[in-house]
Amino acid sequence: MEQKHRSEFPEKELWDLTALYQDREDFLRAIEKAREDINQFSRDYKGNLHTFEDFEKAFAELEQIYIQMSHIGNYAFMPQTTDYSNDEFANIAQAGMEFETDASVALTFFDDALVVADEEVLDRLGELPHLTAAIRQAKIKKAHYLGADVEKALTNLGEVFYSPQDIYTKMRAGDFEMADFEAHGKTYKNSFVTYENFYQNHEDAEVREKSFRSFSEGLRKHQNTAAAAYLAQVKSEKLLADMKGYDSVFEYLLAEQEVDRVMFDRQIDLIMKDFAPVAQRYLKHVAKVNGLEKMTFADWKLDLDSALNPEVTIDDAYDLVMKSVEPLGQEYCQEVARYQEERWVDFAANSGKDSGGYAADPYRVHPYVLMSWTGRLSDVYTLIHEIGHSGQFIFSDNHQSYFNAHMSTYYVEAPSTFNELLLSDYLENQSNDPRQKRFALAHRLTDTYFHNFITHLLEAAFQRKVYTLIEEGETFGASKLNSIMKEVLTDFWGDAIEIDDDAALTWMRQAHYYMGLYSYTYSAGLVISTAGYLHLKNSETGAEDWLNLLKSGGSKTPLESAMIIGADISTDKPLRDTIQFLSDTVDQIIAYSAELGE
């Protein structure tokens, strides 16, 4: 499957960024305007921030600057992710990065003044509804503040600290070349995107196996570079943790999420211990239904019933999304309708494109979504997932100040995975045929929970071991990372999957390792979304409560936000309820198979 150039795709499959800026020149003018506003803000407030009134007035003006920075930062980032080979996009990204660094440095005086402000001033500011999140974060930073000169120096080094992720992202987009492979006498093209989105769950065993070996060999060629980039990332995080006086790099990385180490460890430990047997039971059933004597790592994404895995058009996908989110009501649905009408999504699976998917949030413009469309049902899950993220952006942006709009990383994946559950629910209820119902439940497992409760959770278990190494003063290279990943995979899958040296390269497949302790939050968010989904099914106020959670943005802590839908995440009950829900789902799938005589 050879990738086309971006120019070969129809306009309707490309996003329209003109809601942000008309063109590059318009973007550059916006940068100059923002620079002028920042300079004026500095002249007005540098050295003049002392009282509650000083800060209240400054926050009002700073919000307008941050909104400009939100628009500039998103526009700078997005075009390049559609084609890393495009020089103009690279220039836009560079201009945006330089501006962001300059702006951050110029505005450090405000953060410095805020964190050294009297507690009484911070307490009064924290009572203002539009500043609750900003003041909570300021108080966290206050406890680990290094002084104006050091903090400014660290801000100046922002681009340097970002370099490991930049290296990895560009390597994955431009350097990972997968060799052609042959299956049944036919030659197939392979790439990072086509393997991840198409071949890894192909119905043909030889195609799965050969594509996985081609894919793994392509990764292996770059394992030493990837390991070096990752080592630089975790060493810089450990350095910052030590400088700021945190007890560990874990405490440092969890601080901004407003959760503690106990919640982090519980998420990993309970899933590794209690969900692993559920996942193993399901995969052994998949192997049985598909007539496999053993299941290798090339097979674990195999659909339970590949004959029911239809090709889906983009129009079909939008129709499925609209029908799936109907339970949330008109207020939500009218926003979702705009995605197709106004081209908020970039679907083109062109060469040079970032292989992942994401949702961008230029504050109070409208969100954008990037993905690569291959026509599989899994793409519909990706689309509704990213619409979940960006739908939350719409509701929080419209109901919260800029300072309160952003959810804690801990549960930022809840809105996205909640939408996936709505899609599976819709698919399950479209037929009384046990095969169709089994198909829907299997996709609930594989497209939602396996990705978030397994793929990303195993990343988190891997990360925990890596950061522990660094905490103990050790280092690592590619061979050590391969060994750790192989150990984690084996611990989770037991005898359900054969784990080999190619599977050990899995750590090279995700950019999440460059985002702190982000990977585990997929499963944490899914616990909250599962609680929200069950609340929707069992309560008359379920839809309203969920929308209220979306509207709350970052105005509340993770524990407070989860309580909006009745989930107490200070305990292990929501996580155990989720695991039981999944165990029941596997039981129902096996029962449907028995009904079908399989």
Identify the role of each PLM range:
Residues 1-306, 318, 592-598:
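A well-structured
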Residues 8-11, 22, 110, 114-115, ...:
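C-terminal, non-catalytic "cap/extension" segments appended to globular domains
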Residues 245, 374-394, 416, 421, ...:
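Active-site recognition of the HExxH zinc-binding catalytic motif
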Residues 309-314, 362-384:
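Short pre-active-site segment immediately N-terminal to the catalytic Zn-binding motif
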